Amino acid sequence: MFASKVYFSLTEILDAAHHRTHNEWHQLDHRPENLLLPGVAWGDRWVRSPDCAQASAGLAPEYARTHYAIMYWFREPLRATLDEFFKLSEFSFQWGRSPQIGWTKRPLRGFFSPVKGYVATRVRVSADALPRRPVKGIHVTVSRLRRHDALTQEAFRWYDEVRLPDLLHCRGAAGAWTFASDDLFAPPWDDSMPAWSFADSGSRSAEAFPLRMTIMYLDEDPLEYLADVAERDVAWKAGGRVHDTSTVEEVFFSSPFRMIVPWEWNWFDTAKAAS
């Protein structure tokens, strides 16, 4: 695996007048500096345009106003990598190059461990190369796990053996990666982290609410991908290939995003004019 950890964030812009400034800063300043760090394997950013927002689902109202998603992949040694990553963030502030402070809100941000990568048979690259491969968009699903038992394991098996392979046949699907939040991987001897390790067989309902995330990488318009999934689901349901996983997970956020093309940042101009 080319990276042992990822940082993922959902971002809301509180003032529509700042979308262009925010994109200029992140795409032309912040991201290039981050990618220069030796421990940063890759980093990308996507926009949840108004039409993507209309095609979204999920139970968490705090994510409903999300405009952007950000992800960085980190190499080992992780401690040194993150030290440099956060040091650059502070230096950027000291240089006067953090204009996003004051108009951004991040309803979701945190570290995840990559679980497994999948690649469509038509795509020639490896799963490790998939995040670096150009796409037209992605689809992100974030779920909160309700439990950590045999039923959950069976749901994960269904995702791995049935659901994700099926989705890779949908229009534009190039591949996928699954992720699990850090609290699922705390060693049982580490009291500083929530007790959600496999060694803790008796009390997985602690206060922690671990997250599971899936990202689909798309070569076609993300809305066309979703339309194809909906059409194929009719036959898949009739054939018993679609399972109800609501007993083991709550889908907090499920949304398509578009790739951000440099200098083409006009998705929210109507909202800006109205404000």
Predicted regions and their residues:
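Macromolecular interaction modules
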Residues: 1-275
